[in-house]
Amino acid sequence: MHRLRGCCARPRGAPLRAERSRASSRALRVLVDMDGVLADFEGGFLRKFRARFPDLPFVALEDRRGFWVSEQYGRLQPGLSEKAISIWESKDFFFELEPLPGAVEAVKQMANLQNTDVFICTSPIKMFKYCPYEKYAWVEKHFGPDFLEQIVLTRDKTVISADLLIDDRPDITGAEPHPSWEHILFTSCHNYHLQLQPPRRRLHSWADDWKAILDSKRLR
């Protein structure tokens, strides 16, 4: 995420298919964000915030607005922004996040599709003592060691070339003003209220028809 601000990859026993996919000019490249798309950043943050600061006010998930958790907490009460940040800067925060429902299964299926290259594209926080390592450990835990080759760590996703980026952040900007990918907004508690203007599209959850979104790019 939020917040900070994400594999798939070659399944065991299928290295030849993956190599052919990468070599094919028809391969569809999909970037999948991690926090808020694969891992439940919002739920994990709220649980740990309330456990550490039980007497302080908090923002319920249904009241979340805006991508940046720390900004909304800062408006709630002076000093809460720093306390919020301390949660995700703590050891084991990223590693202990639970997968979002259906995320692991969907991305594994996606990685097995013919002519499809899938990468987790995630932005580590600037306080890097724990975050980068824990992101790799999380992927290994939930996807297996082969998926580690499919991780892209970057603070600027606009410079990564792909056909699709599935990400819960509504506004993704960076050095490249015209990224190669189409941004599919993954619905989260902080963005569900936003009205997207066509041709922008959403993926409401991993139970939604993500295959249709991929197929729509193949037809172009």
Curated annotation (Swiss-Prot):
Annotated binding of Mg(2+), by residue: D33, D35, D168
GO cellular component, one term: mitochondrion
Coiled-coil boundaries: none
Cofactor: Mg(2+)
Top-rank taxon, per record: Eukaryota
Residues involved in substrate binding: D35, F41, F67, W68, V69, W88, T122, K157
Catalytic residues (positions): D33, D35
Alphabetical list of PANTHER family matching this protein: 5'(3')-DEOXYRIBONUCLEOTIDASE, 5'(3')-DEOXYRIBONUCLEOTIDASE, MITOCHONDRIAL
UniProt record similarity statement: Belongs to the 5'(3')-deoxyribonucleotidase family.
Function recorded in the entry: Dephosphorylates specifically the 5' and 2'(3')-phosphates of uracil and thymine deoxyribonucleotides, and so protects mitochondrial DNA replication from excess dTTP. Has only marginal activity towards dIMP and dGMP.
Subunit composition and interactions: Homodimer.
Protein name: 5'(3')-deoxyribonucleotidase, mitochondrial
Organism: Mus musculus (Mouse)
Gene: Nt5m
